[in-house]
Regions:
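Extreme N-terminal starter segment of soluble prokaryotic enzymes
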Residues: 1-3
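Residue-level signal for inorganic ion chemistry
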Residues: 10, 72, 118, 159, ...
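Conserved phosphate-donor
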Residues: 38-57, 163, 178-210
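Acidic, low-complexity central loop/insert segments
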Residues: 63-153
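Anionic-ligand binding region
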Residues: 140-143, 152-154, 171-186
Length: 220
């Protein structure tokens, strides 16, 4: 199997051009290639496939083999690959995903894509569509008991479920413990990616995220 490894701000995947080859049992392949000790090492596997409704399709699998619906960083890399390797030859493209068709604008310099902007669409806040179990129509700054501690969460979907938790101090957060507890909480039937956010000032936030078995930190 020929592959390309790419990343968007550290969110790395193994990409396979399925215009040229077929991947049998992609769930098993995703588990194998994602292993950072015995495989290639990645957050998952993304297959770039032909599509009847868009310029190409992104078929993604998480590192545990489960199928994913959408990844903003992943789809930007799909767009770069598709242009750089001749699948598309235009700077405005469409990519089919499990969460619908996404539209991307490419910046091309010297024949190669240098930047990609993706229209992720409007955020989904309706609880049943995310999905998150709640008596309320929307979960915005609502309490959730996780491992005996109350966290105030906002639930949103941009193609897959996210829980956003604002905290006063995230430096001492045990993300490897609390991350899986959020991910597998009964309130999230399709599991959840969790972002813990500390506001530093009006221009700066610090985040720690737990995304399907992987923790990472960012600042902006």
């Amino acid at each position: 199997m020929k592959f390309t490894k790419m990343h968007g701000i550290g969110n790395d995947y193994v990409y396979v051009n399925c215009f040229e080859e077929t991947v049998e049992n992609p769930s098993a392949v995703a588990r194998y290639v994602s292993d950072r000790h015995f495989g290639i090492g990645s957050d998952g596997l993304i297959l770039i496939k032909p599509s009847k409704i868009a310029d190409c399709e992104m078929d993604m699998y998480n590192l545990d083999g489960s199928q994913g619906a959408m990844c903003g960083n992943g789809i930007r890399c799909v767009a770069k690959y598709a242009y750089d390797y001749g699948i598309v030859n235009k700077e405005h493209i469409s990519v089919a995903t499990k969460s619908g068709i996404k539209y991307l604008d490419l910046t091309v310099e010297n024949g190669k894509v240098s930047q990609v902007k993706v229209n992720m669409g409007s955020p989904i806040l309706t609880a049943r569509q995310i999905p998150v179990v709640s008596e309320k129509e929307e979960v915005i700054n609502e309490p959730l008991d996780v491992n005996g501690k109350i966290y105030y969460i906002t639930a949103v979907s941009m193609g897959n479920p996210h829980a956003i938790v604002y905290m006063d101090d995230i430096d001492h957060l045990d993300i490897e413990k609390i991350g899986p507890a959020f991910e597998n909480h009964v309130a999230f039937p399709d599991r959840v990616n969790t972002e813990f956010v500390e506001v530093i000032d009006e221009h700066t936030v610090k985040t720690v995220s737990y995304t399907h078995l992987r923790a990472h930190e960012t600042g902006a």
